[in-house]
Amino acid sequence: MAELKIPAGTNARHDLLALGALVTRLDPGIVPFSAADHYDLHVSGGEYNVAANLALCFGMKTAIASAIVDYPIGQRVRSAVRAAGVEAYYVQYKHDGVRGPNMGQVWSDRGQGLRAPVVFYNRANEAAALLGPGSFDWKAIFGGGVRWFHSGGIFAALSETTPELIVEAMRAARAAGAVVSFDLNYRAKLWSAAGPDGPGRAAAVLGRIAEQADVILGNEEDLQMGLGLAGPAIGGKSKLDPA
């Protein structure tokens, strides 16, 4: 197995650069959605969370490349990213006051006791889904020095163009000497929303992206559904089964 060489961080502008969607997550706590009157708002994103936690927990120099919308929700997202200490490279979109483009929205009821957690989305006309090849000046971004580049399967599932952008960014990262990682993060709801062939297309799309990565992250479901690898039935064992 080849040794993974992480570039020295002395002169690098970013220890990690993430590419993905920024979303607002509405959380009613332990109250079911149908009974909740209030929700806590969190700024999140499968790829962004890596950058935010490295910055907040370890003081690392991180950044996010994403889409932002010029309306109050977008301003709230900007503030949260800034407060986390994450630098941002934004493609800016203007909201038309009615239809968008919008910042994606995730609803997450954490469940309680025997009631399982529930997650669903409102990602209609999402700004991040409009991103594609050419959206970012990778030469300028990586020119400042980036040690590690990261993206994920949630962003890849948003549109036909986001996987192409991920591949473009990975190639630029590799050319700049950065380590490249990809979190498969298979989400059946997102791929199914792409149409009846969505789940089948996931393996082809994620497989092509995975070929560009030095590090692949995922669990059994990600590997089977996201890459089409053979394995035991995903639902065949309890989540608590140590085997």
Give each language-model segment a name.
Residues 1-33:
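Positively charged, low-complexity intrinsically disordered leader regions
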Residues 13, 145-146, 213:
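Short, well-ordered alpha-helix to beta-strand connector turns
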Residues 35-44:
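Short pre-catalytic strand/loop immediately N-terminal to key active-site residues, enriched for Gly-Thr
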Residues 61-153:
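Conserved N-terminal subdomain of the carbohydrate kinase-like
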Residues 64, 180-182, 216:
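Hydrophobic faces of well-ordered beta-strands that scaffold small-molecule active sites
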Residues 189-243:
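Conserved phosphate/ATP/ADP-binding segment of small-molecule kinases
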